[in-house]
UniProtKB/Swiss-Prot annotation:
InterPro entries linked: Ser_deHydtase-like_asu (IPR005130), UPF0597 (IPR021144)
A GO biological process held by the record: L-cysteine catabolic process to pyruvate
Family: Belongs to the UPF0597 family.
GO molecular function: L-cysteine desulfhydrase activity
The name this protein goes by in its record: UPF0597 protein CPF_0803
HAMAP family: UPF0597
Amino acid sequence: MRELYLKTLKKEVVPSEGCTEPIAIAYAASIAAEHLKGEIKEVNIYLSKNVIKNALGVGIPGTGGVGIEIAAALGISIQKSYKKLTILSNFTEDELKKAKEIVDKNIINIKQKNTNKALYIEVELLSETSKAKVIIEDTHTNVTLIECDDEIIMDNNSEVSEDLEEDYKLFKIADIYNFAKEVDFDHIKFILESAKMNEKVSEEGLKGDYGLQVGSKIIQKGNFNLFSNDASNKIIAASAAASDARMDGCAMPIMTTAGSGNQGIACSIPVAQTARLLDKSEEELARALVLSNLVTIRIKKHMGRLSPLCGAGIAGATGASCGITYLLGGDLENINYCINNMISDLSGMICDGAKETCALKIATGTNAAIQCANLAINGISATANDGIVAKDVEETIESIETLIQNGFKNVDDTILNIMLEKKKNNK
C-alpha cells in the first residue's frame, strides 16, 4: 500500500488557482479553442448540476467577476491548456480584455446536461467553418473527448481514470495511520508544500478585505470581539481567511485535496497551525498532513467528487481533526474516536455551491476539528448509540455514502433550483 498512498497523494494534492469547477471549464474551453479554426461565433457549454452549482457564484481570480461565462471566456482567450488547473494564473491584460469582449458578445450559452455524473463539462465552440468539442468527466482534468470538425482527436474511456479512485475505499484508517507514522520522511517531504502554499493565501486573507472577512474578524483587535485571542481561534481564523481570499478571487495558487481548494485548506492549515503552536518538527507536521490528506481523500470517495454535502466541512475538517489528534500524541484508537466525533457533528452540512460563505463552513469545520480532537485525545467518542455512528469507524465513514445515496437524492436539484431562480429574479 505504501506506493499506492504516495501515488495517491501526488495525484490528489495538486496546485490550482481559483475554484476548481470554473477552472475545469476554462481548461476545457482552452483545449477546444486550440483546435478550432476561424473566429468563434458561438460557445455552448453543457454542465452537470453539481458543476453549475459550484461555478455559478464564485470569484474568478484577477477578473473582478464571478461565474461560468468569464471563466470559459478566459480559457478561450488564454489557450494554454498545458497548465491544467493553473490555467488562470498570470494571464495578461490583453487576454483578460479579449475574454471580456467574448462575454460582452453574448455568444456563451450555458445548459444543464442530463447526466448521472456529478462532474461533467462539455464545451463546444463554433466558427463559420469549424466546430470543436471537449468533454471532461469524473475528475477536473480527466479529458475524455476532443473532437474537431467531426474528427476524433482523443477518445479516452473515463473508467480507466477511475481505477486508482476505486482503490480509495480500500484505504482503511488503521492502514493510513500506520503509513503516516512509519513511512520514510524523505518520501513525504513534498506534502509540506501544501501547508506552505495554503498558509500564504491565509496570510493574504487575514490582511485583505476579502469576502465576508470571516478569518480576519475572528482575531480582530481594537473593537469589542466575542472571540478571545486564544490558540483555537487563531487556528480557525487562519483557516477561514484562506477561504475568504480564495472564494473572492484572490490570484494566488492554492494546494487542492481531492479536487477542491477548500478541502485542501480545511485539511492542511489547521494541522500546520497546530504544529506551529506545539513547536513540532517538519517531520511531525509532514506525518500529520499525510494522515489528514489521506483521511480526507478516503471520506471524499464515499461522498463523491462533487456532492450535496460539504466536502471541506466534513471530509477536509475530519482529516484535519485526525492530524491534530496525531500531533497531540493520539494513537489509532484516538483517531477512530476523532472520526466518529466529527461525523456525528458535521454530517448534515450541505453544499450550496462555491461562494464567499464557504469560509463560514470552513470556520465551523475547523472549530469542530479542534473540539473533536480534544475529546478524542481524552478518550471520549460518540458511540454506536449515537445516530449514524457505528461501532466500527469504517462503517461510520460508509454511512456518509448511504446518507447521500438514499437520503439526499433531491438535495442538489433543490439547491440548484433555488440558486437559478434567485439569479433569474435578480436580473
